[in-house]
Structure formats: C-alpha cells, structure tokens
Design a protein with these regions (language model features):
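Short, polar/acidic, helix-capping and beta-turn segments at strand->helix junctions
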Residues: 1-125
Length: 125
C-alpha cells in the first residue's frame, strides 16, 4: 500500500491522505474546491467548484500513476440537487469514459462547498 501526496492538489484538511494505491488501484479521498496554490476555496458557483474539484482529482491521479481516463467509479456529493445539470456539464468534460457513478445530495460539505467527488481508478502500467 502506498500513500500518495502531491503539491499540485490541496493537502488533506483532516487525518487522511490524498489517495492510497493498492493492488493496482488508486482510491482518492474526496476532493473539494480548494485551490492548491492558495489553500482556500475561491470558486463560488457549482460550475467553478466542479472545475476545481476535477483539476484536483486529475493532479492526485497523475501523482498516483493514473489518469482521469482510468477512473472506474466516482462518488459525487452535491449540496443542492438543483445544481445537477450544471455539475454534469463540467463533470462530463473531464470524465469522458463515463465511469460508474453514484451522485447524492447531502446536507453539508466541508468548508461549505457545493460539491465533493472521490474516485477509484486503475493505475497505469
């Protein structure tokens, strides 16, 4: 088991890693719209936040030897399901392979963000 860390994605804000690689798979922790350069949530809209989340996931996957194209499954958390269409528009531009997915509305997310996504992906050989 290997713990993944990259400066190109936000550092964990709790007692967890950015990702773990084991048995040819990478499991990313949930990513929120923290800008890794500033350490702050700067994006305000669901579109902007989803864009930042996807960039963060891409950076973690690349650090783990994987990519967005290798994603098998995502779990998506939205603060408001009325954001579903706008979220899907950005999400679909990043996850073009259409991985399996769960998407649920939740009452609240860390730092009061609008979206959080975690992934499972194959590690490139």
């Amino acid at each position: 088991m290997n713990v993944i860390y990259t400066k190109n994605a936000p550092a964990a804000i709790g007692p967890y890693s950015q990702a773990i690689v084991t048995n040819g798979l990478v499991f990313t922790s949930g990513q929120i719209a923290i800008n890794p350069e500033s350490g702050a949530v700067e994006a305000q809209t669901i579109t902007e936040q989803t864009e930042q989340v996807c960039k963060n996931i891409k950076a973690v996957l690349e650090a783990a030897g994987s990519s967005l194209e290798n994603v098998i499954k995502t779990v998506c958390f939205l603060k408001d399901m009325s954001d579903f269409a706008a979220f899907n528009e950005v999400y679909g531009s990043y996850f073009t392979g259409k991985p399996a997915r769960s998407c649920v509305a939740v009452k609240e997310l860390p730092k009061n963000v609008l979206v959080e996504i975690d992934t499972v992906a194959e590690v490139s050989e």
